[in-house]
Amino acid sequence: MLARLVLGTSGRAALGSVEPALGGLKSIWRCSQAFCSTPKGVTYRELKSLLNSKDIMLIDVRNTLEILEQGKIPGSINIPLDEVGEALQMNPVDFKEKYCQVKPSKSDRLVFSCLAGVRSKKAMDTAISLGFNSAQHYAGGWKEWVTYEISEEKQES
């Protein structure tokens, strides 16, 4: 039926040539689904655990003024979104000089955060495109972090 919709009523010869192509498309689709379904977001609890284990580099991509006005997640470093691509391609000496941290390797686990997840997702996509395949983002961002932290402080009181 699909062959007739695509190729008209040309018959079995056309159907024979379409089936291998459809098989190839199905294979590509399965591979893309596996890639796309890889979890790239972290939750508040996962981020807390990762920060406690010191197993990540948390990069806040908000601009410096936002961080000064609102605060930041402890342990994060600030690399504004418009600098992420350039920063991840810097040589290690320049990176250390500018950001006071050792430059991450492509195998290191990076987590990006922002205010509410939009910019951190863009930063993660940039990092992945540069070969940092373990990059993730904290979609809840600073807004969610503050909410959970205040809630935990109240429970401890």
From Swiss-Prot:
Residues 52-154 form the Rhodanese domain. SMART domains: RHOD. The modification N6-succinyllysine is found at residue 96. The active site is at 114 (cysteine persulfide intermediate). GO terms for molecular function: thiosulfate-cyanide sulfurtransferase activity. PANTHER family: THIOSULFATE SULFURTRANSFERASE RDL2, MITOCHONDRIAL-RELATED (PTHR44086), THIOSULFATE SULFURTRANSFERASE_RHODANESE-LIKE DOMAIN-CONTAINING PROTEIN 3 (PTHR44086:SF10). This is Thiosulfate sulfurtransferase/rhodanese-like domain-containing protein 3. The gene is Tstd3.
